[in-house]
């Protein structure tokens, strides 16, 4: 299991992922990053966060519990192209005994522009019982540390948005 005894990285507010590269195979016939691969980048970034809080791949193997995404709202704001280097920020907006609510931003690493956002609700799941489960105390503690750090950040303007098409008068 990952050694999470040093909580220092949890205090990064927001968490910033490692740099990732837009792969050539991810480009669609419009010449830019296909919408599905934005989620690959967001998912890889959240895997880094999950390792920090102790619910990564090794956690699933050791404890038979994992995280499932229950809902996601993605906004595509600016195109990315093959070879672009990107990074993702992660802000924990809230959590309870079984759920995480977080907001991610995908930025071009060199130019800094915001390319996409993704707001997510994730569930902690016991794979044997096939239902949600309480976070164990060690994970709950790390989540509390992260949330305390992230609570100092302003809430993203786009958090809580919904899709709508207002009717013209």
Q: What spans do the regions from the language model cover?
A:
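HotDog/MaoC-like acyl-thioester-processing domains
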Residues: 1-18, 80-85, 92-169
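A positional/architectural concept
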Residues: 15-32, 36, 40-43, 63
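Residue-level recognition of the GNAT/N-acetyltransferase active site
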Residues: 23, 77, 108
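A broad, structural micro-motif
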Residues: 33, 67-69, 115
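Hydrophobic beta-strand-centered segment that forms part of the acyl-chain substrate-binding groove
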Residues: 49-100
């Amino acid at each position: 299991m990952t050694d999470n005894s040093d909580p220092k990285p949890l205090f990064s507010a927001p968490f910033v992922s490692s740099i990732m590269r837009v792969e050539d195979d991810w480009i669609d016939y419009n010449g830019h990053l296909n919408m599905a691969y934005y989620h690959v980048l967001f998912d890889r970034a959240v895997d880094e966060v999950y390792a920090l809080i102790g619910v990564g791949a090794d956690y699933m193997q050791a404890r038979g519990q994992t995280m499932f995404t229950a809902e996601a709202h993605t906004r595509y704001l600016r195109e990315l192209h093959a070879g672009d280097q990107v990074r993702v920020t992660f802000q924990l907006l809230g959590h309870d005994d079984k759920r995480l609510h977080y907001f991610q931003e995908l930025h071009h690493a060199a130019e800094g522009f915001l390319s996409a956002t993704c707001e997510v609700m994730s569930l902690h799941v016991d794979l044997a019982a096939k239902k949600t489960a309480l976070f164990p105390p060690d994970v709950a503690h790390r989540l509390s540390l992260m949330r305390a750090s992230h609570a100092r950040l302003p809430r993203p303007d786009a958090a809580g948005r919904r899709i709508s098409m207002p009717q013209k008068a």
